[in-house]
């Protein structure tokens, strides 16, 4: 009788955890809604991938777009081109169609509003040889900057996969990149952060590229929640332009939040 009770209790416990596991498994097809998308969740404490969707896309390289601002920030802080999070560049007066871009911009606002012209002030100061050296040390994607100093990361020659983005962010969050500790600390400080109703923090960077016939969206970030500490990457593509007044990177960020909510992590 006692063994029967123990067996029944064990089966109930197994059933409970099975139900819990099913409840926290995202419905990826419903979330991406026809988009060719992928997702990676890396558990920093366990040191392994906790969840991955569409592995083949996670292995493909794409233009990093504005997610590359993280690498630019690391280089610029390390070289002293940016002194701190308040380093400000003056607006050149050119109307770029956005109030947040048409003004003097600090390093913090550069990432917050994803100001492309701020990046384009930094990369010529770094120079091609220096950037190539850093990218080799970072082991960043295909390291190809032949597309030009002011746009090689913007739908051009530089490519990186979602899996490679996770590896790069892993080195950043573990303070293992070949730059100064101060450069890594300041870079992490200026990464935009959101706080969920449950108190989880998600610090990350969007990336967008689009033409008249296609869209590419990125979100890569760091999640700190009661269940642990994770790195996340979302990437998707569509054979159509984004909706009016919509940036694919913002869509990718919302997709990431939805996935994490369904996993009960955010």
Regions found by a protein language model. Give the residues of each.
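Mid-domain, small-residue-enriched loop/turn segments at the edges of structured enzyme/sensor domains
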Residues: 99, 106-107, 119-169
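Short, well-structured active-site flanking segments
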Residues: 78-93, 179-184
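Beta-lactamase-like hydrolase cores
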Residues: 19-63
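Bacterial N-terminal signal peptides that target proteins for export
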Residues: 1-9
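Active-site SXXK
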Residues: 61-85, 110, 232
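Bacterial N-terminal signal peptides
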Residues: 8-16
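Structured C-terminal helix/loop/strand segments within mature extracytoplasmic catalytic/sensor domains
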Residues: 24-31, 124-129, 174-200, 204-266
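Acidic helix-start/capping segments at beta-turn-to-alpha-helix junctions
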Residues: 87-103, 109, 115, 126-127, ...
């Amino acid at each position: 009788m006692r063994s029967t009770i123990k067996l029944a209790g064990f089966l109930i416990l197994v059933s409970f955890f099975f139900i819990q596991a099913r409840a926290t498994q995202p419905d990826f097809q419903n979330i991406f809604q026809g988009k060719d998308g992928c997702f990676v969740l890396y558990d920093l404490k366990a040191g392994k991938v906790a969840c991955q969707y569409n592995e083949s896309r996670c292995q493909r390289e794409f233009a990093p777009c504005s997610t590359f601002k993280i690498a630019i920030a690391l280089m610029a802080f390390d070289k002293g081109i940016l002194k701190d999070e308040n380093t400000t560049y003056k607006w050149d007066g050119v109307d770029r169609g956005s109030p947040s871009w048409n003004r003097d911009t600090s390093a913090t606002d550069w990432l917050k509003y994803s100001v492309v012209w701020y990046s384009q002030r930094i990369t010529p100061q770094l120079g091609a040889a220096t950037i190539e050296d850093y990218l080799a040390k970072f082991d960043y994607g295909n390291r190809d900057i032949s597309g030009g100093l002011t746009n090689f990361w913007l739908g051009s020659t530089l490519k990186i996969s979602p899996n490679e983005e996770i590896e790069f962010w892993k080195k950043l969050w573990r303070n293992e990149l070949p730059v100064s500790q101060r450069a890594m600390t300041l870079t992490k400080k200026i990464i935009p952060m959101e706080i969920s109703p449950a108190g989880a923090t998600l610090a990350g960077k969007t990336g967008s590229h689009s033409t008249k016939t296609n869209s590419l969206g990125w979100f890569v970030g760091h999640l700190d929640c009661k269940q642990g500490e994770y790195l996340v990457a979302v990437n998707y593509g569509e054979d159509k332009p984004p909706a009016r007044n919509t940036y694919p990177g913002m869509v990718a960020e919302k997709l990431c939040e939805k996935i994490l909510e369904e996993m009960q992590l955010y």
